């Protein structure tokens, strides 16, 4: 028997999606190097590879993230929408990059409850 390795869903928290204008320099350096070719940047810019087979996606980000611009999440959601892949996105007004569970910012911490509801809505558990 063969098992599919395609994920049933993706959960993206302040994701790095773009290797061009809205890149996170540290991620780009670690993934493709300082002197990456244009083709490498294209390959690692995930919004350019969304297809109707992309799994449903839950995204959250903060608009004040100074490390990874919120445009990364917006670009990915736009790409999902264009091929009619189901997604839910939450953009919170405050919060730095790397908040984890965000317990120190109650308004942002609600992402966990939203995720749980999304998982149930999509019959993932």
Ranges and model annotations:
Residues 34-49, 54-55:
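Active-site nucleophile elbow and catalytic-triad environment of alpha/beta-hydrolase enzymes
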Residues 53, 58-61, 65:
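Short beta-strand/loop motif that positions the catalytic acidic residue
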């Amino acid at each position: 028997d063969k098992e599919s390795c395609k994920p049933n869903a993706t959960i993206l928290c302040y994701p790095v999606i773009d290797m061009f204008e809205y890149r996170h320099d540290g991620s780009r350096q670690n993934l493709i190097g300082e002197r990456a070719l244009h083709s490498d940047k294209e390959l690692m810019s995930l919004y350019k590879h969304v297809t109707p087979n992309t799994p449903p996606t839950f995204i959250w980000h903060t608009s004040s993230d100074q490390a990874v611009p919120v445009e990364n999440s917006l670009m990915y959601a736009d790409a999902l929408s264009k091929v009619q892949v189901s997604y839910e996105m939450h953009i919170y007004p405050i919060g730095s990059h790397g908040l984890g569970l965000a317990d120190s910012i109650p308004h942002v911490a609600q992402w966990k409850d939203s995720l749980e509801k999304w998982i149930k809505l999509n019959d993932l558990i």
